[in-house]
């Protein structure tokens, strides 16, 4: 049995296109980076290739949509030097630690350091906003009602209820969280 470094899953039309023409960056208009916490480390090498080489000569818009870790990855890719930004993110993310009994203020303070590493200055933020080819969109979950409580016990109770509601049906999560989309406005090439 042969082993392959990359497994391609595609529908019949896409698979025929890939077999006939190979992978061509111009064939892709949208890329989605899902959440997944530290699992994104498995994609780090592929990310370096995709945004350091494969998409580097792109002259048309590539819409990238990320949530959680995917949002951080893609915030790196919309910068002028995506490889360097991705390395900064990887370094910061892999070295973050929290004290055992950290409160939310300390967790927020420590987590903010990742933002400082991904965006060391306002220049990198502006690069994301002004990038003519890489158009960033982010999906976040906004806590609603009791889920947005600042008190630890209320929040823990709400998350427990949300988990239970999710077991019944994902539709019930709308009572606890709202999906919010952020995107970079403006014209695409």
Language-model features: where?
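Gly/Ala-rich beta-loop-alpha elbow adjacent to hydrolase catalytic centers
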Residues: 66, 70
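Patatin-like phospholipase
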Residues: 1-63, 76-189
